[in-house]
Structure formats: structure tokens, C-alpha cells
Amino acid sequence: MSKEKILFIDRDGTLIVEPPVDFQVDRLDKLKLEPFVIPALLTLQDAGYKLVMVTNQDGLGTDSYPQADFDAPQNMMMEIFESQGVKFDDVLICPHFNEDNCSCRKPKLGLVKSYLQQGRVDFATSAVIGDRQTDLQLAENMAIKGIQYNPLPTDKSSLNWQQIVKDLTTNPRIAEVVRTTKETDIRVKVNLDETGGNSIETGLGFFDHMLDQIATHGGFQMQVNVKGDLHIDDHHSIEDTALALGQALKEALGDKRGIGRFGFSLPMDECLAQCALDLSGRPYLKFEAEFGRDQVGDLSTEMVSHFFRSLTDTLACTLHLSSTGHNDHHIVESLFKAFGRTLRQAIRVDGNELPSSKGVL
């Protein structure tokens, strides 16, 4: 079963206003939605989140809280949500009092046990949203993010619905990969939403310059530190850097919602570099370039195609890359620049839709 981005959301005091006197929404006239909850939930759904309601209802089904008194406002609330396009995949209710010492009352895990056992929860992106400390404790027990709701937050410890949307949908696209083998020790960090401040040290000056071209023309920040067996040759350092960079880019892209996906051609002096890119989730490279020299600077020209081959393997992209010209320096640089400009188009975020009819990339 594939893991899902799931929001486990409290009801009273989070989705609807909780009456301050008896803390029970047991009549229709007591039903009132929290501010901006519907547009917030719609935006979160569009961002790929599944919605699950998780609520403690003290003594539900007893004389103090008859089932029928609960059902009328609950059904009305669900009808309102559904009429506006908000869909809850599940509604989980604990009917017990605290003193009953049941296994399902929040913050215990009884209500959400099946989600955890079935491996449905993406722990990196899922969250619990609620107005009480018990909701935050539930999040801690589930090992996922906890967000405390407050319609009028006074500090950063709690958020209203508009702030919750921003918090969950504008996470920085950052990834760091460390790759250590007998030949190399490599650290690559990328931030797809920041520019400048690149720091690249591979031990190969011209290769550093080419990686900087990718970051500069790609419009993102890159930090690369490589310690490799350059006393033998440059093969392992270049190959493993490409593998680590591809993996970092893939991780930073996340589920790829809203990205352009596709990309571009670039002239450089007498060269014409052509690059077409699809962040398809499928590795494929078609590379066409001829070099008259074995090296440009301290970079072996035979490693240029191998760099892009290794990068496409871990980035899992389809890449068509070619360049024609007479100056090997220009040919190599045009390839890296063209790839950077193409990548810039492909990773740019414009909306929340997943650019695939399959529903996954």
C-alpha cells in the first residue's frame, strides 16, 4: 500500500466552534464553522492531502449525550462540507469519558491504529491539527507533525486556518544527500526556492564551474563538497557527484505538484545546445556531442556524458541533450547551461496540480 499525505483533524474547536459552556454541539443552532475552514480544506485537498476527522465525544450515546443529539448537527456539518467539495475519507469518534480509560480516546492511538498498522501514513508530510494539547500529544504518539489551531493566534505556537494552509503547502524544497564509498565522500545540498550562495568544491576546477552553471541557470542554490580518489582519475568523483545531485534534486522536488515538469534549447557562440527534459520518474538519456580533446581543463570529456547518465538514473528523468560546435570548452559549457535552463523551467512551481494524468510522477 502506498503511503499518503493525511491530515488527522479534530472537530470541536477546530472545524466547528466549541460551545464554551457545555462543550457539546448537540443542537443545530449551536453549529458554527470555524473561520476560513472550508477554503482552507479545499486548498489542502488540492495539495494532495487526505482528510480524516478524529474527535473525542464525551459520553456519546449515554443519557448525558444522546446519539440523536449528536447526529443532527454532525450530519448537517458533513452535508455542508460535501456541498462545498470538502471530502473526509474517514470520521473516527471516541464516545468514552476520560475516566473510562479506553484505548481509543485521544491522545491514545486506538482510533488511528489501523492507519499506522497498514502503513498508509506518510510520516514526513502527514499531520494532526487540533486546538488542544491532546491533539499535539496524539501527533507525537503517531510520530507526525502536530499543528495547534487557534482562530486568533497570539504567537507562532498556534495557527489559524489560513496560516495552516501556508505552513503545509509552502514548505521549502530542500534536500541534502551524503554519499560515502571507498572511492568518494560526497555531500550535496540543494534548495530549489533560493538562488545564489553556491559553494562547490569537487577538486576539479572546471567541473566546479560546470556544476555552478547548472545551479545558476537552474535558478536554485547548490552546495557540493567532494573528497575523491583524484590521484587515480576523475571518474569516481564525477560519477558519484552526479548520482548524489540527481538524488538530492529528486528528494527536493517531493511529489512534484505544481511544477512545470517539461523544458529548452540554448545557443552559445558557435554552439547550439539542445535540451529536452521530462521529470517523468523514468530514467532515460539520449546524449549527442563530439569532442576533439580528451580534456577541457581538468575535466575528462568522456565523463560529460557519464555525468548526465548517472544524474538521470537518480533524478529519474527523461533527458535529450545535444550540442554541436567547434570549441570543446563551449560545447561542454553549453550542455551544462542548457540543462540548467531546462531544469529551471521544469522545477518552477505554478499551482498545485500534479502534471500527470496518472496521478503520480
Curated annotation (Swiss-Prot):
Residues noted as binding Zn(2+) in the record, renumbered to the chain: 94, 96, 102, 104
Catalysis performed (reactions): D-erythro-1-(imidazol-4-yl)glycerol 3-phosphate = 3-(imidazol-4-yl)-2-oxopropyl phosphate + H2O; L-histidinol phosphate + H2O = L-histidinol + phosphate
InterPro entries: HAD-like_sf, HAD-SF_hydro_IIIA, HAD_sf, His_synth_bifunc_HisB, HisB_N, Histidinol-phos, IGPD_sf, ImidazoleglycerolP_deHydtase
Region (Histidinol-phosphatase): 1-172
Subcellular location(s) of the protein: Cytoplasm
Cofactor: Mg(2+); Zn(2+)
Active-site residue numbers: 10 (nucleophile), 12 (proton donor)
EC identifiers of the protein: 3.1.3.15, 4.2.1.19
Family designation: In the N-terminal section; belongs to the histidinol-phosphatase family.
Name by which UniProt lists this protein: Histidine biosynthesis bifunctional protein HisB
Organism per entry: Photobacterium profundum (strain SS9)
